[in-house]
Amino acid sequence: MRREELLVDNTLSSLVSSHTLSALFLEALLDIDIHCVASKAAIEGDKASILYHCKREPSQNDIDEVLAFIERVTRLHVNALHVSEPARHELRSHVEHLHEARLYFRELVLKTLKPYLAVNREYMLVLLWRGIGVIAEGERDKVHIPGSRYVATAHTHPGSLCLPSGRDLEAAAALLADGGCCTAILAPSCLLLIARRDTLSLDDYDTLLALARHVDKMSFEKLLQKLSMLASTSKTITIQLLSL
């Protein structure tokens, strides 16, 4: 395992609407299918530190690709780079990584998005594959971030329940089918987490899309029943509804 530390200027406030996070920590969302993934990012004051763990020694092209991605996506300018000595790292199974990621993401959503429930508009947390986190402010009843592939997303439902709309379920199906880990909806009374526990099956993908087509016409009780049935029968999706 190789570790790289990137020191970058902090212009994160331009990415989180009118709010500035004094510190944002993203830990241990590891993907065993790519060379380098961010295991920790800390942003304080005018500096940011991002640690990368790699399965093999990165080439100069790998490093250039990572730096270009960070600058393009986050608008952060890299002004220093330090590469440490390789260290031992035992790769665990993909399923174990997904389990760890679900537990971490659930706590991250509660920690970072809960303060925004007091605001009467939706907010979204997006985690990119390189470990960068973005919080975006949406409109009164919706928020949308176009563009890139995400490892995980979450958004708030202020003043309402954490039940998904048809668009929420379509977005969840697309994210999980594209290799993403999990998506969540946070409301004042509950948290809904939809996540992969293995490679998404075609049956589960079709079930999510079928549910998305009809969910807006369902009663509250019917939707809960459908979600519970999917959670109990699926081999590749887990659904958790947590009371707060």
Which sequence ranges carry the predicted segments?
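Active-site-proximal loop/helix of nucleotide/amide-processing enzymes and allied scaffolds
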Residues: 1-84, 137-244
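Short N-terminal helix-initiation segments at or just after the protein's N-terminus
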Residues: 60-72, 95-101, 125-129
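Polybasic, low-complexity association/targeting segments
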Residues: 84-115
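A generic short-segment signal for beta-strand/edge and adjacent turn/coil regions
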Residues: 90-97, 122-123, 151-155
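A short, well-structured beta->alpha microelement
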Residues: 110-112, 130-145
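A short catalytic or substrate-binding loop motif that flags glycine-/basic-rich loops and adjacent residues
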Residues: 116-120
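Short beta-strand scaffold segments in enzyme catalytic cores
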Residues: 122-129, 182-186
